[in-house]
């Protein structure tokens, strides 16, 4: 048995476990009141799309699942900006995703920003649309979720009206 391989798998398991423990509980957090107003904006100013939302992944020539996130090629050092008003619920370095920021926009809507070069916000901090939350690296992976369901970010960005939310009752 190759010990290097088993150590490598153990490291992957540790990174995945750390990610699950930090991020997955956010999927089930109770929704707070709506914090955004107007449209959502792309967190990167200058970018090229590397992996688009819904794009089919191909590994080893075999077709796989569809991407739940969007990966952008970005300019290192440029600001990564809050896509909408909200509260930072996670801002830390995770072994699997690097510097990670999660913003709760209310009503169960959250943005997950992975792979930043640096963080400039802290957990519990309120942020406004367009406010820098960190510095971009070579690429940014962004995932927008309503609860635990991923949302196509381009639909959020294409209108100034934003995501509409109707209160029950």
Q: What function would you assign to each model-found segment?
A:
Residues 2-13:
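Short, small-residue-biased leader/transition segments that mark boundaries at the very start
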Residues 14-40:
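Acidic/glycine-rich phosphate/pyrophosphate-binding loops and surrounding catalytic core
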Residues 26-34, 50-82:
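Short glycine/threonine/proline-enriched tight-turn/helix- or strand-capping micro-motif at secondary-structure
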Residues 51, 74, 90, 115-118, ...:
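A residue-level detector for short acidic-glycine micro-motifs
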Residues 61-64, 70-73, 100-105, 143-145:
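Short, acidic/hydrophobic/Gly-rich beta-strand patch recurrent on exposed beta strands
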Residues 79-89, 121-136:
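Short, well-structured beta-strand-loop connectors
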Residues 82-117, 139-141:
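Zn2+-dependent peptidoglycan hydrolase active-site motif and core
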Residues 101-102, 125-169:
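Conserved, short, structured surface segments that act as functional micro-motifs
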